[in-house]
Amino acid sequence: MDKTKITVVTIGHMPAEFNKGKVTSWNSSVFEITGEIESYTLTKDSDGSAWEFTDSSLEEVLPDTFQGDFLAAIVNVPLELNWYTRRLHNNRLVFTFHEIKEILIHSNIPLENIIYRLIYAYTLFYKRSGNKIQMTGEHTNFAHDETRGCLFDMNGIKTDIIYSCHNPIIYPNCIEKLKQEKVSNEVISKVQKEITRI
């Protein structure tokens, strides 16, 4: 089984508590982070009515070319609709520490845990979507509304994110969906084993 290759970058100022080295040194048999986590400057101002950065604005800031199968960009600014992650064109996604950082720190959860959780969730999403990251506007059934401590929790109430950032699971219904969408039993089993380290 080939590992999914992921390019991780940061855009703009990062929280002092975030350790990029921990993310690059994470050992997985399912994915591989390509190279080091490079840092880019946030060259635009917010363009949304609530001081958020819209998808179209971030499309212009994120690198267009990268080595991995998909690109995960980490920012520390508000995103469109106040979500904490958005899926963009060309197999790119963005995650923000905005509001999430304080929630994790308050619960004594390392900031890196949300990155591990999202990398596993998006790796499975990439595989079940035919090796692509579908855009935010595309209907995917990627996440569920109810908080279950699962990789695929929506976390519409952001404070619920703590339940999937410490010893997360893959909920049984989500496992069945992954199998129906042709993710191998071996990949699912490896992810289940590895996420116990989060």
Task: Give residue spans per PLM region.
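N-terminal pre-first-transmembrane soluble regions of secretory-pathway and organelle membrane proteins
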Residues: M1-N76, Q134, I162
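Active-site-adjacent loop/helix micro-motif of nuclease/hydrolase catalytic cores
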Residues: F53, L81-Y84, L104-H106
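Hydrophobic transmembrane alpha-helix bundles
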Residues: L71-E80, S107-R117, P172-N173
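Catalytic zinc-binding patch centered on the HExxH motif and its immediate surroundings
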Residues: P78-N90
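A short, glycine/acidic-enriched catalytic loop
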Residues: H89-E99
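Active-site recognition of the HExxH zinc-binding catalytic motif
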Residues: F97-E138
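Metalloprotease/metallohydrolase-associated module, dominated by Zn2+-dependent proteases
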Residues: N131-I198
